[in-house]
Amino acid sequence: MEREKVVLAYSGGLDTSVAIKWLMQKYSLDVITLTVDIGQGIDLNEIKNKAENLGVEKAYVLDLREEFIKDYIIPAIKSNAMYERVYPLATALSRPLIAKYLVKVAKENGAKYVAHGCTGKGNDQVRIDLGVKALAPDLEIIAPVREWNFSREEEIEYAIENNIPIPVSRKNPYSIDENLWGRSIEGGILEDPWQEPPEDIYLWTKLENKEPSYIEITFEKGIPVKLNGVEKDLVGLIEELNKIAGSYGIGRIDHIENRLVGIKSREIYEAPAALVIIKAHEALEDLVLPRELAHFKRMLEDKYAELVYYGLWFDPFREALQAFMDKTQERVTGKVKIKLIPWSFSIVGRDSPYSLYDHSLATYDKGSTFSTESAVGFIKLFGLQNYLYALKGGKNA
């Protein structure tokens, strides 16, 4: 009798490596692995070979970097998406894409199940489960880590007993997730919010340059298209900016985060390009968007980031907000100058053909065209409701 199939989102790390053997032993399933390239910067063929050596039926490796950029990172840039105004959502943005291809590979192979290595405490379980169910309600989801309740130590023991090669040891107990948009590090000493993260956990943000320098990012309709005047595809631009900003130690985030499941967690991120691009994009929007639109957009950005963080990428609310965000970007074209110094950066210049900044109106020097005489009438009308309220006794009525 032919065994049922399961498609496992496979990273090559501890959880999913253990999950391959566990799914075979516990559920008697034929395992198909799916590994996606979203800019991890590692040899994915090695991961494919590892999966095959563990006895999987098929091992898929898909290069999804362009799709990740086009359909997930660009919408996030347009929305200045930062959960709790701190975290640029690198991991959260990748999960709906992974869910999409879990469904696709499952359908192609007639699999009844999909599986992932998310824990029962984290946000990723929600993101992938909701993504899969939004696209294929008929598929069943197995989350081995939620079921087996292994501690990190017990997982390592299981791997050793089953001859599973893993990149984690008792001396290096970190769980790392990485893509083009950012890198996250969890576990070990980092779980103590009082302890300073050891320097050796950082890979992208090491202080190598101490002399200040300037970079320039050019945007077209909200999308970065040039770095220092040189046109680049966004994959290349992000990769180069990660290196440039990261060499100043820029991009480290140490954050107490409110997880969707109700707990607080200590999260360490590296996101040099993401932080610089979003701040530059905000600065350009400040120059070209009318005040009311700019203010309202900032409010919606927080909700947008929450929806992405919560795993509601395919929700109609997120899609409706995206339509609004896209509309706001029609004039977000121009360039932004950024100064880089050790451990920090600042916006020091911005220019756009759609700039609403008018020097002749804004200047306090001689020659200003602003009509100060009009201010008296404006103030009277603007404050008319408060004036009438005060006449009727105001707060003392």
Swiss-Prot record:
The keyword Membrane does not apply. Its EC number is 6.3.4.5. L-citrulline binds at Y87, N123, R127, S175, S184, E257, Y269. GO terms for molecular function: argininosuccinate synthase activity; ATP binding. One of its GO terms (biological process) is L-arginine biosynthetic process. Keywords: Amino-acid biosynthesis, Arginine biosynthesis, ATP-binding, Cytoplasm, Ligase, Nucleotide-binding. ATP binds at A9, Y10, S11, G12, G13, L14, D15, T16, S17, G117. The keyword Cytoplasm applies. It comes from the Bacteria. Pathway: Amino-acid biosynthesis; L-arginine biosynthesis; L-arginine from L-ornithine and carbamoyl phosphate: step 2/3. Pfam families: Arginosuc_syn_C, Arginosuc_synth. GO terms for cellular component: cytoplasm. Disulfide bonds: none annotated. It is found in: Cytoplasm. InterPro entries: Arginosuc_syn_C (IPR048268), Arginosuc_syn_N (IPR048267), Arginosuc_synth (IPR001518), Arginosuc_synth_CS (IPR018223), Arginosuc_synth_type_1_subfam (IPR023434), AS_cat/multimer_dom_body (IPR024074), Rossmann-like_a/b/a_fold (IPR014729). It catalyses: L-citrulline + L-aspartate + ATP = 2-(N(omega)-L-arginino)succinate + AMP + diphosphate + H(+). L-aspartate binds at T119, N123, D124. Belongs to the argininosuccinate synthase family. Type 1 subfamily. Homotetramer. This is Argininosuccinate synthase.
